[in-house]
Amino acid sequence: MSRDPGSGGWEEAPRAAAALCTLYHEAGQRLRRLQDQLAARDALIARLRARLAALEGDAAPSLVDALLEQVARFREQLRRQEGGAAEAQMRQEIERLTERLEEKEREMQQLLSQPQHEREKEVVLLRRSMAEGERARAASDVLCRSLANETHQLRRTLTATAHMCQHLAKCLDERQHAQRNVGERSPDQSEHTDGHTSVQSVIEKLQEENRLLKQKVTHVEDLNAKWQRYNASRDEYVRGLHAQLRGLQIPHEPELMRKEISRLNRQLEEKINDCAEVKQELAASRTARDAALERVQMLEQQILAYKDDFMSERADRERAQSRIQELEEKVASLLHQVSWRQDSREPDAGRIHAGSKTAKYLAADALELMVPGGWRPGTGSQQPEPPAEGGHPGAAQRGQGDLQCPHCLQCFSDEQGEELLRHVAECCQ
C-alpha cells in the first residue's frame, strides 16, 4: 500500500502546528509586555493631568485636552484589540485547528488500515471535512480582514495623533517665545519658566508615547504577517489533503496490489512460524518442568526412605549396644558364679586349672555349666551326650574352641574375639 499521495501534507502539518504554537506563545509574551506598557502609560497620563491641573495655563488648553482624549481613546481601542476578542478568537482558532489536525491524523491512520469499500466511505467523509475546512478558512480570512481593518484604523489614529502633537508643539513653542519676550519685563519670570519646562516635558512624553504606539502598530503588522504565513501553510496542508484524496480515488495497479498481498502473506507466514516455534519451546519447557518435578518428588521420597533407614539403623544400634552391655554383665556374673562353684566342688582340680586357664576358658566353663548334658539350644536334632570319663561335661566342647556364644554355643578361637562380639550382637537380637 503506497503512501506517496499526501505525504507533503503529512510533512507540512507538524510544521504548521509548531509555527502556530510559536506564534501563540510569542503573542502571549507580547501581550504581557504591552499590558505593562499600558499600565506605565496610564500612570504617566495621570501624572501629566495632575501637573496640567497645577499649572492652570491659558495657552491652548483645549489642544492638550483633545490630545489626552485622543490618547485615551486610542488606548481603549488598543486594549480591546489586544486583550479582547482578537486574542480569544485566535486562541479558539488555534485550539480548533489543533484538534482538527489530530482528527485528520487519526482518520488517515484508520483509512490506511481499512479495506477498499470502506475507503470510499472515508473519501466521502474527507470531502465533507474538506468543505468544513474551507468554511473555517473563510472564517479565518474574515478574521484576518478584520485585523487588517483595525490595523489601518490604528495607523490613521496614530497619524492624527502625530499631527496633533506637532500642532501642540508649535503652539507651545509660540507660547514659550512670547513668554520669553514678556518675561524680561515680568517680575515672576521664574514661575513661567517652570511652567514652560513642564509643558515641554509633557510634549516630550507625548512624543515618546507616539513612538511607542508606532512600535505597537509595527508589532500588529508583524502579527498580521505571521497570520498570513499561517494561512499559507494551512492552504498547503489543505492542498496536500486534496492530493491525498485524489490518490485514494485512483485505483491501485493490480501488480502493486499483488505485491502488497504477497508481502502481507509472507509476514503472516513468518508470524505463524514464530508462533509454532514458541509453542514448541513452551511444550519443551513444560516437559522439562514436569520431569524436574518428578525427579524432585523421587528425590524427596528417597530422602524420606534414607531417613527412615537411618533412624531404624540407629535404633537397632542402640538396642544392640544395650543388649551387648546386658550380655557383658551376664558374662561377668556367670564368671563369678563359675569360679565360686569350681572352688567349692573341685578344690584340687580347680586350683590346678586356675593357674593355667584364662578368663575366656572360665567363660566357656560357665556356659557349659548353664547347659548341662552337652545339649545346645540352637540345634534341635542333637541328643544329649554323656560326659567324658575322667573329666567334666564341657571338656569336648572346649577342645573345639576357646570361646563360645552363650545363645547358640558356637565356638571361636582366641584370635576371634571381635567376631564373637559381632556374632553375639546378631544372635541375641
From Swiss-Prot:
Keyword rRNA-binding assigned: no
Modifications the protein undergoes after translation, according to the UniProt entry: In vitro phosphorylated by CHUK. Ubiquitinated; undergoes 'Lys-48'-linked polyubiquitination probably leading to constitutive proteasomal degradation which can be impaired by IKK-A/CHUK or IKBKB probably involving deubiquitination. Deubiquitinated by USP35; leading to stabilization and inhibition of TNFalpha-induced NF-kappa-B activation.
Region (Disordered): 177-199, 372-400
Keyword Metal-binding recorded: yes
Entry binding sites for Zn(2+): 405, 408, 423, 427
Superkingdom of origin: Eukaryota
Pfam families according to UniProt: EABR
Bias-annotated ranges (Basic and acidic residues): 177-195
GO cellular component: cytosol; nucleoplasm
Region (Ubiquitin-binding domain (UBD)): 289-347
Matches recorded under PROSITE patterns: ZF_CCHC_NOA
A GO molecular function held by the record: protein kinase binding
Tissues in which the protein is found: Ubiquitously expressed in all tissues examined.
Subunit structure and binding partners: Interacts with STK11/LKB1, TNFAIP3, IKBKG, NFKB1, MAP3K8, TEK, RIPK1, CHUK, IKBKB and SMARCD1. Interacts with polyubiquitin. (Microbial infection) Interacts with severe fever with thrombocytopenia syndrome virus (SFTSV) NSs; this interaction promotes TPL2 complex formation and signaling activity leading to IL-10 production.
Protein name (Swiss-Prot/TrEMBL): TNFAIP3-interacting protein 2
Source organism of the structure: Homo sapiens
Gene: TNIP2
